[in-house]
Structure formats: C-alpha cells, structure tokens
C-alpha cells in the first residue's frame, strides 16, 4: 500500500510520462493480498524498482536515484540528513579490444555530502498546497490526471501478480 506514494513521486519526477513496461510479482502471507511486492517499471531512459513489504521488521522509506554523474539516496524516516548525495559514477569503458564478453566498467568515487533540508510537516504542506490551489484556482500537483496515471500503473501491476 506504500507503493502508491512512491509511484506518485516517480510520476512527478517523470513529468507525467508513462512507463513503457510494467512487471510485478508478490507473495501472500497471512491474508488474501500480497504482503511483499516487487514492481519494475521501464521508462525510455531508465528503470525503477519498487519494493513494498509490510512484514519486514525493518521499516524503510528510501528512494535511490542512480545518475550518470551522481547518485542520491533519500531516507524519509531519518530525522536529519535525509538526503545524501554521492559524488560517484559508473562508466563503461569502450575501445577496439573490448567486446561484449570483456567490457570494462570503471567506478569513480569522490565522497558524499548531505545538503540541509528544512524539516517540514509533509501532510500539512500537502493540505496547504491543495487549499492554495483552490483559493488561487490553479491545478494541484495531485490532480485527477496524475491520480489516474498512478492508478493505471497499480492496476497493471496488480493484474501481473495474478497471472
């Protein structure tokens, strides 16, 4: 049930673009719905892997973004330093002597830092944004078309689990 929030974040980051492929799997324990789910989304230039697990003794709300120049890890349950920027990248070295069987991957690591993020109440901010959208007659970030896109992804993922 937390995947809906992750999908909303991905939808926002992707500016509403739909994935080109959706695959999902899960396991049922103790009830008729999946307790553990894995959803894989493919977009034009990258992939997303979501894991939801309400049985795990370790509660995590993390988002990892791996880019060509840097990597980010956002840990929502931490009280401080929720965002860590890794000055790290991976590059595939190519050349005449490198084939599919012996390609070379080079990892470059330059350290990490955590930018300051002012602690705020996410629920309050969401309600205030919605209120402001009504007062100013502007479209909210969580609008009907965004909700429909996220719902369609969830529906396809759920159907994949029942195959």
List the predicted regions and their residue ranges.
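Alpha-helix N-cap/helix-start motif at coil-to-helix transitions, marked by capping-box chemistry
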Residues: 4, 97-98, 117-125
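Mobile, glycine-enriched helix-loop/loop "lid" segments at the mouths of ligand-binding/catalytic clefts
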Residues: 73-106
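Short glycine/proline- and acidic residue-enriched helix-loop micro-motifs
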Residues: 108-115
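A generic structural signal for secondary-structure junctions
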Residues: 14-15, 88, 162
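A generic structural motif
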Residues: 42, 66, 84-88
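Rossmann-like dinucleotide-binding domain that binds NAD(P)(H)
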Residues: 1-58, 64, 77-78, 145-148
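C-terminal helix-rich "cap/oligomerization" subdomain common to oxidoreductases
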Residues: 115, 122-163
């Amino acid at each position: 049930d937390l995947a809906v929030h992750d999908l909303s974040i991905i939808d926002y980051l992707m500016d509403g673009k739909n994935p080109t492929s959706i695959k999902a799997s899960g396991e049922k324990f103790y009830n008729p719905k999946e307790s553990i789910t894995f959803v894989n989304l493919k977009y034009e230039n990258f992939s997303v892997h979501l894991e939801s697990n309400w049985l795990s003794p370790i509660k995590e709300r993390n988002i990892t973004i791996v880019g060509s120049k840097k990597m980010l890890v956002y840990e929502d349950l931490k009280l401080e330093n929720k965002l860590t920027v890794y000055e790290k990248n991976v590059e595939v070295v190519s050349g005449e002597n490198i084939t599919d069987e012996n390609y070379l991957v080079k990892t470059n690591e330059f350290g990490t830092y955590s930018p300051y993020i002012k602690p705020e109440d996410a629920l309050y901010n969401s309600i205030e944004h919605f209120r402001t959208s009504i007062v100013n007659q502007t479209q909210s970030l969580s609008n009907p078309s965004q909700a429909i896109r996220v719902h369609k992804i969830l529906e396809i993922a759920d159907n994949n689990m029942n195959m």
